[in-house]
Amino acid sequence: MAKQDYYEILGVSKTAEEREIRKAYKRLAMKYHPDRNQGDKEAEAKFKEIKEAYEVLTDSQKRAAYDQYGHAAFEQGGMGGGGFGGGADFSDIFGDVFGDIFGGGRGRQRAARGADLRYNMELTLEEAVRGVTKEIRIPTLEECDVCHGSGAKPGTQPQTCPTCHGSGQVQMRQGFFAVQQTCPHCQGRGTLIKDPCNKCHGHGRVERSKTLSVKIPAGVDTGDRIRLAGEGEAGEHGAPAGDLYVQVQVKQHPIFEREGNNLYCEVPINFAMAALGGEIEVPTLDGRVKLKVPGETQTGKLFRMRGKGVKSVRGGAQGDLLCRVVVETQIGLDEKDKQLLHELHESYGGPTGEHNSPRSKSFFDGVKKFFDDLTR
C-alpha cells in the first residue's frame, strides 16, 4: 500500500513554515495520543504516522530529500539506519501539552526558538542558469543589543518567579490526582523581569531591517528553496534564531522555455529554406550557434543541441537545447513572386500535392474515403 503524503498527514501545505508544522502536529498528536485512545489500534497507527511525518518535515535535510524524492528518499536505510524510531526530542512539543493533562511535566520551559522567515526572490532565466549573488533587505526581530536578549535592564537580572519558585510549573490537585500545569505568572519561564530593558521593554528582541548577501547556485528553478541558517527571527530571551528560506521564482523568458534541465525554443524558417535546406543561426544562453537544416524539413521537427541546456544544481550532465522548426508562410509577395508560386503549385499536381506533398495527398485521400463511406 502506498504511503500517504507527509504534508497531507499533518494537513499543511508544502510551503508551510516550521511553526505551522509544529502547531498542526500538536493538535493531531493530542487527538490521537495513545493515552487518550487506549486500546484503539487505528488511533495508535495514526499517531505513528503523525510522528513520522513530523520528524521528517521539521528536519531541514530530511525535508529537502523528501520534497525531491518522496518516500523513496528513506527506503533501504536511507535515514542512516535510524529510521523514525527515536532521535527526535518530542518533549519540546509535548511538555506543555501532555504535562498539563497527564501530570508528566518537564519543568521549566525553554525559551522559544526564533521564527523561520521566507523571502520570495524573482530571477531571470539567465541568473537561474548561471548563478548569481544578490543583496536582499528583510524586516526581522533581532536580539536587543542593550540587554543582549535577557529582557532585563543592564545591571539587573531576571528574578526567580515567586509562584513556581523557578520550576516553570505549578501543581493543581483535582480529587486524588495532582496535575502539573504551566505557571500562569511567568508562562513557564521560571523567571520574571522586574526592571525591563528600556530599549526592548523586556522582550529581549527589537524590530530591525537587515541586509543579507545571498548566493544563488547555478541551475536553480522555480520552487527551489535556499536555507540560510540562523538568519530568521532572534529567539526569545537568548534562544537560538530561526532560519531564513529564500524561495526561487524564475521569470518567463521571451525566447526559451525550461523543462527540467532542457531548454526549448521555436525557430521560424521560410518555405525555401525548409524545402532546400541550409544553415541558420539560433540563439543559446552562451551566444549564437550555427544549425544545419536539411532539405524537406517540416514544421515541428526538433533539432537537439547537446550540452546547450542547463546544468543541474544537484550535479550530473548538462541539459540540451531543443529547437522546434516552424515553417513560415511568406507575406508581402509581389506579382512576380505570386506568378512563380502559381507555377510551382501547378507543378506539384494541384492542391492534393500528389507528387511532392505526400502528407497532403494522404489527407485528401482520407477525406474522399470519408465522404464515399457516408454516401454508401
Swiss-Prot record:
Q: Enumerate the residue ranges forming zinc fingers (CR-type).
A: 131-209
Q: What induces it?
A: By heat shock.
The entry's keywords: Chaperone, Cytoplasm, DNA replication, Metal-binding, Repeat, Stress response, Zinc, Zinc-finger
**CXXCXGXG motif repeats (start-end):** 144-151, 161-168, 183-190, 197-204
- Coiled-coil residue spans: none
Q: What is known of its domains?
A: The J domain is necessary and sufficient to stimulate DnaK ATPase activity. Zinc center 1 plays an important role in the autonomous, DnaK-independent chaperone activity of DnaJ. Zinc center 2 is essential for interaction with DnaK and for DnaJ activity.
Assembly mode: Homodimer.
What is the name attached to this protein's record? Chaperone protein DnaJ
> What is the gene name?
dnaJ
